[in-house]
Design a protein with these regions (language model features):
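Intrinsically disordered, low-complexity segments enriched in serine/threonine/proline/glycine
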Residues: 133-135
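Nucleotide-sugar donor-binding patch of glycosyltransferase catalytic domains
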Residues: 18-20, 24-28, 59-131
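Donor-binding and catalytic core of enzymes assembling or modifying cell-surface/extracellular glycoconjugates
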Residues: 1-68
Length: 135
């Protein structure tokens, strides 16, 4: 099962993802408290997503993360808690800009490919960093 978690602001995007992913997906964005989100994430095999509260919750409850990072701040500054995570981040000429709005259409994030994320996820699963018996 694929699950989207997040706040109320993530509900519409979560619904787009749920539709794209098909019947094995659930959109729980905007429906759960932080404690509820942590419990759902604790039951997951892995978290795949960007640097958000959900990523930090996943790391705190021991769920391995494929964490997608922009290059706006310093490497390692906001990575998920604990060991056994895969961090995807690409350096660009504007790395360390600290800008909230990117004038280059999020170039550093767009350099991260779906294939790259899938390879990282498979590496987590194969390495045994995943939790067994979880969805």
């Amino acid at each position: 099962m694929l699950v989207v978690v997040g706040g109320r602001d993530d509900t519409a995007r979560g619904e787009e993802l749920r539709r794209a992913w098909g019947p094995r997906a659930r959109n729980l964005a905007g429906e759960l408290s932080p404690y509820g989100s942590a419990e759902v994430l604790r039951q997951c095999v892995a978290y795949v997503g960007n640097d958000t509260g959900a990523m930090h919750l996943a790391g705190m409850v021991g769920t391995p993360c494929v964490a997608l990072f922009s290059a706006r701040d310093y490497p390692g500054q906001w990575e998920p808690y604990g060991d056994g995570h895969e961090v995807l981040r690409h350096e660009t000429d504007c790395a360390g800009c600290m800008l909230d709005v990117c004038p280059y259409n999020n170039k550093c994030l767009n350099l991260i490919t779906v294939d790259e994320a899938m390879v990282s996820l498979k590496r987590l699963v194969v390495s045994g960093n995943r939790k067994t018996g979880r969805s």
